[in-house]
């Protein structure tokens, strides 16, 4: 059955084409497996709470009749402003409009939140852009530049809020820098979510073609309920496609964790156990709460435009397993720098088990992709990442995170990074074990090698399942680097030891695989175990618990002073020619202008496959597809065939770099 929704209808109907519903949520209350909800263009000021799920063979489809024509917003228009002082205006809102959730009394904060807890989940928007929240009315009146902002010219637009308890009103002051808010498009967010079931287990929903914006979402760390403007809420088989997602206070789309009252922001509330311990507990408790391949995950997020959210574009802990995230454009995430903590990125996934992220364009984010804990069977492929770093000279905000294209943290692999274009100053931060980098172009460094893990021990899982197989600390290594291009594109400053999230790591800026010079080859490592003799537990204890795992490096090309690992036998090292790489944007399309292929000349390497990469050490799982099949790396960034020999980097032929990459 098709239900029709049109908020321009003269009155609320029964969902027929002749008498459509005025609200999407009216259809969401009754739609059942196999039904379609067709939504006419218009602005829908509502929270949609789907009651029923579909089945694998009979999905429930919510579709905008015109692509991006149906707009679901968490905000309300605010025109009732009075001039207060200088450029500052004031409005009052009766708190009844907020129901049981007032964004202007709810603070952003919780586990793994490092910035001062001074921001609210509420927001003021001028022409679809968030204003900066001030801590005091005086700061709002001054309207000065917020130095850590990545968009400093916009940071002079401020707002400040307080409560009038006698009148039960929220009072909002805003500095519009000379603009008259009664004549401009000004909104305030009032709803926490836009399209997300309030209960778990609402499966097999397709959400297609909507413009979703301006919700008062909350901080979403791994051992807590993770909400977004859109999200399946601990269910299976959703498709979120062809949507525009913007201006969430925290997260745009959540594939995240359910609410567990016994382990929700436990560290923040009780202090007596570390947030790391509670993350381990969350994994174990998830097994009890239905976290299996049969029940959870297997979602698809595709062809979405996600931007200007202040925590993540996409977030997920455990609920996103076995998912595909493809063909999305994600940019300008956390650019305001008013929120800070360990959960900020274009995509931030914990337990990305068998998750494939491919053909995404991610830029101008604090981080591009962050796979934290249990990146087992995770594959990042054919992504374009650039400008995931602050503007030059921008000071770091209190609680802000370091920047890079990809961060893999405290997982045991196998984590596969292949055929990507990484153009930011740091390509991969790797405080982890079990990574394979194959056929990438990297202009930035490999950093945090051998550090950033502390004494944490994290789970690994039964192959291609969620069930926990074991826990282990980090020996570091167990990494592979084949057929990559490394170019020292940015100036090098002296390596320094930095502390982030309480964990120390080397912040290396030199490009190349030389950071693994002290790591053993496989033959060196295996020789310690004396396989021809009886096992001696005390003698082997250091090699079980303290020594690095082996690293495999071969077939890479190095330019502009990028350095190779001492154990690499076959490579191309060119320190004579000056290689240039320029990302060219024209009419919204991107290509690369480079001379690197002039100097690669006839250097070729072998075709890599899953058997060459082998097995990640702790889970004893091969670098393979989620269905267990072999990967042969004979397709490049654009899907072109490589043939019997391979050129290093993401292209089968150098001429492809000048083609449209996005």
Can you say where each PLM-predicted feature lies in the sequence?
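Short catalytic-loop micro-motif centered on adjacent basic/acidic residues
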Residues: 38, 231, 313-315, 369-370, ...
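Non-catalytic carbohydrate-binding regions of carbohydrate-active enzymes
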Residues: 423-428, 438-462, 487-491, 495-501, ...
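N-terminal pre-domain segments of enzymes
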Residues: 1-2, 658-662
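Predominantly extracellular/luminal carbohydrate-interaction, adhesion, and secreted-enzyme modules
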Residues: 228-230, 312, 345-346
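Long, structured stretches of catalytic cores involved in phosphate-ester chemistry, encompassing
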Residues: 462-463, 475
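Right-handed parallel beta-helix
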Residues: 203-216, 236-250, 260-286, 292-312, ...
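Extracellular polysaccharide-degrading/modifying enzymes targeting complex plant/algal/animal polysaccharides
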Residues: 2-234, 239, 244-246, 252-254, ...
């Amino acid at each position: 059955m098709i239900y029709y929704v049109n908020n321009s209808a003269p009155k609320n109907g029964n969902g027929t084409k002749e008498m459509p519903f005025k609200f999407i949520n009216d259809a969401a209350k009754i739609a059942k497996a196999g039904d379609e909800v067709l939504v006419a263009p218009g602005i829908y000021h509502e929270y949609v709470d789907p009651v029923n799920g579909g089945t694998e063979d009979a999905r429930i489809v919510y579709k905008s009749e015109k692509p991006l024509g149906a707009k679901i917003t968490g905000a309300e228009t605010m025109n009732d402003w009075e001039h207060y002082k200088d450029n500052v205006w004031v409005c009052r809102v009766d708190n009844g409009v907020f129901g049981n959730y007032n964004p202007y009394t709810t603070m952003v904060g919780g586990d793994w939140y490092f910035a001062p807890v001074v921001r609210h989940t509420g927001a003021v928007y001028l022409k679809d852009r968030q204003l900066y929240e001030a801590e005091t009315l005086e700061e709002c009146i001054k309207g000065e530049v917020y130095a850590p902002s990545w968009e400093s010219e916009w940071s002079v637009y401020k707002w400040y809020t307080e409560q009038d308890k006698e009148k039960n009103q929220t009072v909002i002051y805003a500095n519009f820098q000379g603009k008259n808010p009664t004549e401009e498009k000004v909104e305030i967010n009032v709803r926490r979510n836009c399209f997300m079931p309030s209960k778990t287990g609402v499966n097999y929903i397709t959400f297609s073609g909507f413009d979703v914006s301006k919700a008062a979402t909350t901080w979403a760390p791994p051992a807590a309920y993770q909400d977004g403007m859109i999200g399946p809420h601990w269910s299976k088989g959703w498709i979120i496609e062809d949507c525009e997602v913007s201006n969430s206070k925290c997260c745009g789309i959540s594939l995240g964790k359910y609410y567990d009252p016994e382990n929700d922001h436990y560290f923040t509330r009780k202090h007596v156990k570390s947030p790391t311990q509670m993350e381990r507990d969350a994994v174990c408790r998830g097994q009890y709460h239905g976290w299996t391949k049969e029940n959870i995950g297997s979602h698809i997020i595709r062809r979405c435009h996600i931007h200007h959210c202040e925590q993540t574009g996409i977030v997920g802990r455990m609920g996103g397993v076995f998912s595909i995230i493809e063909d999305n454009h994600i940019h300008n995430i956390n650019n305001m720098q008013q929120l800070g903590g360990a959960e900020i990125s274009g995509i931030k996934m914990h337990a990305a088990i068998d998750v494939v992220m491919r053909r995404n364009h991610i830029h101008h984010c604090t981080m591009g992709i962050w796979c934290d804990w249990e990146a087992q069977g995770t594959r990042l492929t054919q992504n374009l990442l650039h400008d995931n770093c602050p503007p030059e000279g921008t000071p770091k905000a209190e609680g802000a995170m370091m920047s890079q294209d990809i961060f893999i943290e405290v997982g045991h692999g196998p984590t596969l990074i292949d055929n990507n274009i990484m153009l930011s100053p740091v390509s991969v931060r790797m405080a982890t074990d079990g990574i394979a980098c194959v056929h990438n172009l990297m202009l930035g460094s490999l950093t945090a090698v051998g550090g950033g893990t502390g004494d944490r021990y994290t789970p690994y899982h039964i192959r291609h399942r969620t069930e926990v197989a074991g826990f282990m600390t980090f020996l570091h290594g167990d990494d592979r680097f084949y057929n990559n291009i490394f170019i020292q594109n940015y100036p090098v400053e002296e390596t320094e030891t930095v502390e982030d999230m309480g964990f120390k790591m080397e912040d290396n800026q030199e490009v190349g695989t030389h950071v693994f010079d002290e790591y053993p080859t496989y033959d060196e490592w295996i020789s310690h175990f004396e396989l021809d003799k009886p096992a001696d537990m005390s003698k082997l204890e250091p090699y079980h618990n303290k020594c690095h795992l082996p690293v495999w490096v071969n077939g890479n090309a190095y330019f502009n002073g990028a350095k190779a690992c001492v154990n690499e036998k076959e490579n191309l090292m060119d320190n004579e020619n000056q290689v240039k790489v320029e990302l060219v944007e024209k009419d919204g399309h991107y290509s690369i202008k480079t001379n690197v292929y002039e100097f690669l000349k006839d250097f070729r390497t072998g075709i890599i496959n899953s058997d060459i990469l082998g097995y990640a050490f702790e889970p004893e799982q091969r670098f393979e597809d989620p269905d267990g099949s072999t990967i042969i790396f004979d397709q490049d960034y654009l899907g072109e065939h490589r043939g019997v020999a391979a050129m290093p980097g993401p292209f089968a032929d150098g001429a492809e770099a000048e083609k449209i990459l996005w």
